[in-house]
């Protein structure tokens, strides 16, 4: 039976204010494999997965976004620790570890007999190289997760000691994310197309924005769940669901059109749950008119999050109440900081002298973003903004222009914090 999985269906429209949460199934890093529970005979199967989050490169040391880790983590790359489905830190390539009384020294005991796909042995030396590479070479902003590290030492082939500058509540967790991916010095020449890791798969073919083919490799220390895995990229959810119903793919994840769940054929299983991602509307407070907090507050009051939920997500989203914190977060509080109040929005604009303020909303070329942008255009225009909608190709242009260069006034994105990526997919 083919499986339709709403791996990221909705999203919380958290406006510097906010709106809703996303429907999705929970899994490990990716929908492709679960190496911890695979049976010995399951590796005779193949699997084709559909996604609308296309990877243009396989090098997440230089390229931001979740599309690359979604495919590579746990499949090609592995980490010293893993984040399981309930958010607990569990053994990975490290079988155990100790933390010093001052919470600054971590001693990891590494799994023996592990090799990289190029034949190199996984040792404490390669683990130290991987951590230092993040600190010294990565240009992806998530490399900041390694800022707490002061020194890394391989005390023997299977013992790694990491000394932090000061105690960190988040550092060990980050070692289960993409920043904790274990690499080898001999595998760095072609990260964009031929990554080398300790995972059950290696990349057999990659066509940017089209597909990634993974083939189970010889010598893996565990048991892969499928012999061959293909991740096919589609321009939108509708085309990916059509491919599922035609038998062209086995799994669809990242569904951002929940109404499609009503139309799938009998015999196709669906799963819907709550994700830890949210749809964020971001206002650049370094640029007018959003350098005035009253204008930002006016936007928050102008957005009818309940209407957005009903119109865009069939009422399946969770309203985060104006805060960019998903309900899966232990610090989530079910409060409404900015209730819909267009009169209050107009009042704030008048106080700020910003009536008729011209703003550009730059949206990534993703189906949900374009739909949300049209609704926001209507709601913001109603309270007195003059809105221009602009599109930025995603990921190539949007990541560089908006996320990287901060060259925007207002933008939106379905977002997940780097610390939450391991439990999103």
Q: Which positions does each model-derived feature cover?
A:
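Periplasmic-binding protein-like
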Residues: 262, 286-328, 371-372
């Amino acid at each position: 039976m083919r499986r339709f999985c709403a791996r990221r269906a909705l999203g919380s429209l958290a406006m510097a204010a906010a709106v809703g949460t996303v429907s999705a199934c929970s899994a490990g890093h990716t929908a492709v494999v679960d190496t911890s529970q695979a049976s010995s005979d399951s590796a005779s199967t193949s699997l084709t997965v559909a996604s609308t989050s296309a990877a243009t490169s396989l090098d997440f040391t230089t390229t931001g976004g979740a599309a690359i880790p979604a495919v590579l983590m746990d499949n090609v790359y592995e980490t010293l620790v893993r984040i399981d489905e309930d958010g607990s830190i569990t053994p990975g390539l490290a079988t155990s570890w100790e933390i010093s009384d001052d919470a600054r020294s971590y001693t990891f005991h590494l799994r023996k007999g592990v090799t990289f796909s190029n034949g190199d042995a996984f040792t404490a030396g390669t683990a130290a190289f991987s951590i230092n590479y993040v600190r010294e070479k990565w240009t992806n902003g998530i490399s900041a997760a390694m800022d707490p590290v002061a020194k890394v030492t391989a005390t023997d082939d299977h013992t790694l000691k990491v000394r932090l500058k000061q105690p960190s509540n988040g550092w060990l967790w980050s070692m289960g994310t993409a920043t904790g991916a274990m690499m080898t010095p001999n595998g760095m020449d072609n990260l964009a197309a031929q990554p080398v890791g300790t995972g059950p798969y290696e990349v057999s073919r990659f066509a940017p924005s089209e597909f990634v083919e993974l083939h189970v490799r010889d010598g893996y220390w565990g048991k892969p769940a499928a012999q061959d895995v293909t991740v096919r990229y589609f321009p939108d959810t509708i085309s990916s669901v059509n491919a599922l119903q035609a038998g062209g793919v086995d799994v669809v994840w990242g569904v951002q059109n929940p109404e499609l769940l009503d139309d799938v054929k009998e015999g196709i299983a669906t799963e819907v749950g709550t994700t830890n991602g949210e749809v964020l509307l971001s206002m650049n407070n370094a640029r007018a008119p959003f350098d005035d907090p009253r204008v930002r507050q006016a936007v928050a009051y102008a957005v009818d999050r309940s209407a957005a939920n009903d119109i865009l997500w069939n009422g399946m989203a969770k309203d985060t109440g104006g805060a960019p914190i998903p309900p899966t977060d232990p610090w989530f509080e079910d409060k409404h900081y900015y209730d819909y109040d267009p009169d209050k929005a107009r009042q704030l604009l008048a106080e700020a002298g910003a009536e008729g303020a011209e703003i550009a909303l730059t949206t990534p070329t993703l189906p949900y973003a374009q739909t949300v942008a049209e609704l926001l255009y209507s709601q913001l225009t109603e309270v007195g903004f003059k809105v221009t909608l602009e599109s930025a190709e995603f990921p190539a242009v949007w990541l560089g222009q908006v996320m990287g260069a901060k060259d925007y006034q207002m933008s939106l994105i379905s977002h997940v914090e780097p610390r939450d990526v391991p439990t999103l997919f």
